[in-house]
Amino acid sequence: MALEAAFSMSFCSFSVPKAIFCERETSSFQRITSRAKGIAGESQVQSSDGVETQVKETSPKVFDKLPERNLDTWSGGRETARGLSGSVVRNTVRKDTTLRHISPSSHSTKVRGDKPEISGGEKKAIVDRSKAYVKLKSLGKEVRDAGYVPETKYVLHDIDEEAKEKALMHHSERLAIAFGIINTPPGTTIRVMKNLRICGDCHNFIKILSSIEDREIIVRDNKRFHHFRDGNCSCGDYW
């Protein structure tokens, strides 16, 4: 499967004598890439050299271009991916934010009434983060015992498998959920906001966790609300 982008059009070709054309617009591009990955797998999705030509013109936020950057990364073009991100930042396109905390990926969860606690990519702003890490490690063991297997394909860094599994476990939405669990009564609904699309591995992890903890866990990413309950998600595993 190939995914190619020209100056003003996006083209998606499948192994059938049909092609899908759509206007070159960020949200539709994201939907096409997401569905293509779901059908064929990341390794079968490739980008053309023209993907990055409209970065500055078409994207108001750096994270709108993550699907294109990731296409380069999945295709082995890590240097191209890094250059794409750098180009966006140099041209004053700002990273997305959640509340007042700016980080590569931000989350907020409310505990103790209306007091917001923030966690982000650097994990510096979360209160009692050491306790949250301990709890997350414990939750990881429970989820593994329940059948969870890390999907390391979602880690785009060129590191070994063990490091990839550790990187997945430290995704900040998991830390935010662990923080919520230790600071709320059993059975309480946990709500987390995330400014990036949740990865497939975290999605699977939270599904299993919702069943183990017997809680509803609501995650709002940049696409939709995910209501996790009893091992299932409201999105039906397609988002």
Curated annotation (Swiss-Prot):
InterPro entries: DYW_dom. Residues 40-59, 101-122 are annotated as: Disordered. GO terms for cellular component: chloroplast; plastid. Residues 1-35 form a transit peptide. Residues 113-144 are annotated as: Type E(+) motif. One of its GO terms (molecular function) is zinc ion binding. Pfam families: DYW_deaminase (PF14432). Binds 2 zinc ions per subunit. Its cofactor is Zn(2+). Residues 111-122 have a biased composition (Basic and acidic residues). Plays a major role in single RNA editing events in chloroplasts. Acts as a site-recognition transacting factor involved in the edition of the site 1 of ndhD (ndhD-1 site corresponding to cytidine-2), which is a plastid-encoded subunit of the NADH-plastoquinone oxidoreductase. The interaction with CRR4 is required for its function in editing the ndhD-1 site. Unlike other RNA editing factors, DYW1 does not contain identifiable PPR repeats but does contain E(+) and DYW motifs. Therefore its association with CCR4, which lacks E(+) and DYW motifs, but does contain PPR repeats, is required for its function in RNA editing. Belongs to the PPR family. PCMP-H subfamily. This is Pentatricopeptide repeat-containing protein DWY1, chloroplastic. The gene is DYW1.
